[in-house]
């Protein structure tokens, strides 16, 4: 059993190597992004850059995993619609009432404000396509389909989810998106652990990004970035109601998700992922 686990890919160290591979790929494609930016515009260049800089390492990682393990199981089926609804509602509650207040309360330097404002200006169809389709597919394939899936075969579920979420947060390269990536990664990882559905993970990620995209489309980002947390929510009472309400909604979703997951246990136990009871080195 120990020998089998050592052959599974990736280990924690190899998972950090995967993130390093993504960073190297991002750096290598910067010249292409710069060139396309001047030839076809920011939105097309950003979409092409993202697909190549994330897609190339995704394929490399996939073939490494396939070579080491022999077979890569990817479940693109949701199965239980109740789990889908609870997971998506939980995603919205977690983002709007828990993550957003934390992220908004962290001061942002002017240099980062300019970056976020520039991103907010890219509000065409291709930018939406990148945020709600390309990013969820490629990032979930890497961080849940390969990294978390492999870690679950070598380590305990808690360690596997925390490590994969940490790496998912780090790849976003700034503290504000790190908090969102890590926290949302833990929730998505928990749902993936109990369903093995990569499609469900992608839909949760897409929902998270869609909310952010809608906020950029229909709000004055410059005004929001210069307001305090209480001002953004329109007063302390509104902030408290938003947080308490979201926490309650999220708690209800978690309660019913646990009930649904118990029903799925026989199917999950017969899935291709063999989860060790203790960590394997």
What does each of the following model-derived ranges do?
Residues 51, 128-133, 137, 162-166, ...:
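Residue-level signature of the transmembrane alpha-helical core
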Residues 208-281:
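C-terminal membrane module of polytopic membrane proteins
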Residues 18-66:
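Alpha-helical transmembrane segments in multi-pass membrane proteins
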Residues 138-163, 190-197:
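Membrane-interface helix/loop boundary segments of multi-pass membrane proteins
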Residues 12-20, 47-48, 84-87, 125, ...:
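Hydrophobic alpha-helical transmembrane segments
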Residues 27-30, 177-233:
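Functionally important transmembrane alpha-helices
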Residues 44, 70-135, 149, 153, ...:
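Juxtamembrane helix-loop-helix connectors linking adjacent transmembrane helices
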Residues 1-9:
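Short, Lys/Arg-rich, polar N-terminal cytosolic tail immediately upstream
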